Amino acid sequence: MMTAIGMMSGTSLDGVDVALIETDGERVTAFGPTGYRPYTNDERGLLREALAEAVNLTRRDARPGVIGMAEHAVTMAHSDAVTSFLARNGIRREDIDIVGFHGQTVLHRPGERLTVQIGDADALAKAIRVPVMHDFRAADVAAGGQGAPFVPAYHRALAQSLGRDGPICVVNIGGVSNVTYIDGADTLIACDTGPGNALLDDFMLRTTGEPFDRDGRLAQQGRPDADWIASALNHPFFALPPPKSLDRNDFASLALPDRPPADGAATLTAFTAAAIARIVPLLPKAPERWIVAGGGARNPIMLEMLREKVAPAPVERADALGWSIDAMEAQAFGYLAARGLKGLPLSYPATTGVPVPMTGGVVTRP
């Protein structure tokens, strides 16, 4: 059994989630404490600049200009996150077997076999004095896979604790939304479904100065533009069968016409819910249960809109099952780090489109 810490900095650019689990790489035997280290406004601004610059990258190891500055900021933020986490919870470094370090995705173009996560694992391992596993996605993309989503193996481990007969979907609504379809047998299908919070968060920042729509309050006051949503759902991505994946900026060109902020928030919230529901006809069977994690799970308006789209199947928050809403992806990368140490698969043909089940990750020691 291993004690693993996972860290995740997602496409929402909000901060670093930290989580400890006990696992053998197959089962999760215990959930440990979780933590969160928000990015400062300066760090978040630097990451947004890096995202804009990264569209010009052609090599995954290139770190020109602001991207190199952002990599240093990401590394230091993760070092601070794990050091504070250990101190706050009275955990000794020597009791940690592995730290799973995802880094910050700034570019994801699997069609070009290119995925770029910034973060210096060597510097991090030296700073925290614990072995670090990183570069989880590279082997999958190099082999022709989508390189995402990577959390399905962890979703399946969690689902082992559920008494279920029919298929379920576990949804993570982060900057990008993704689903994992798990049936009563061994079928595991996963894919990105479309924008999660990214378009909405960007809209909120641009129109209100707020980083996100807390509790869906603004969207609740507005009216969704059904015509705009129907047009947006004509994007060819939505007709593709799984597996498929997205870059955070793939839908950035979708422009809302001028409208009151409340209507814009309502439209983008409804679009996220509708995009998730569009996966149902592409699955072997309609899911009988939906379990939602990620920042979107804290938006009751988004959940209500999703319920309307997938009825009569129930939609519930992950924390109703004792799972973590905010730290699930961090837990997943601790779990994946343990799997990587044992050479177990991290991705599968039906989750990323990789030709064969693939292990991955690179270990850096202090």
Curated annotation (Swiss-Prot):
The keyword Acetylation does not apply. It catalyses: 1,6-anhydro-N-acetyl-beta-muramate + ATP + H2O = N-acetyl-D-muramate 6-phosphate + ADP + H(+). Belongs to the anhydro-N-acetylmuramic acid kinase family. Gene3D superfamilies: 3.30.420.40. InterPro entries: Anhydro_N_Ac-Mur_kinase, ATPase_NBD. ATP binds at residues 10-17. This is Anhydro-N-acetylmuramic acid kinase. The keyword Lipid biosynthesis does not apply. Keywords: ATP-binding, Carbohydrate metabolism, Kinase, Nucleotide-binding, Transferase. HAMAP family: AnhMurNAc_kinase. Pfam families: AnmK. GO terms for molecular function: ATP binding; kinase activity; phosphotransferase activity, alcohol group as acceptor. Pathway: Amino-sugar metabolism; 1,6-anhydro-N-acetylmuramate degradation; Cell wall biogenesis; peptidoglycan recycling. One of its GO terms (biological process) is peptidoglycan turnover. Its EC number is 2.7.1.170. Catalyzes the specific phosphorylation of 1,6-anhydro-N-acetylmuramic acid (anhMurNAc) with the simultaneous cleavage of the 1,6-anhydro ring, generating MurNAc-6-P. Is required for the utilization of anhMurNAc either imported from the medium or derived from its own cell wall murein, and thus plays a role in cell wall recycling.
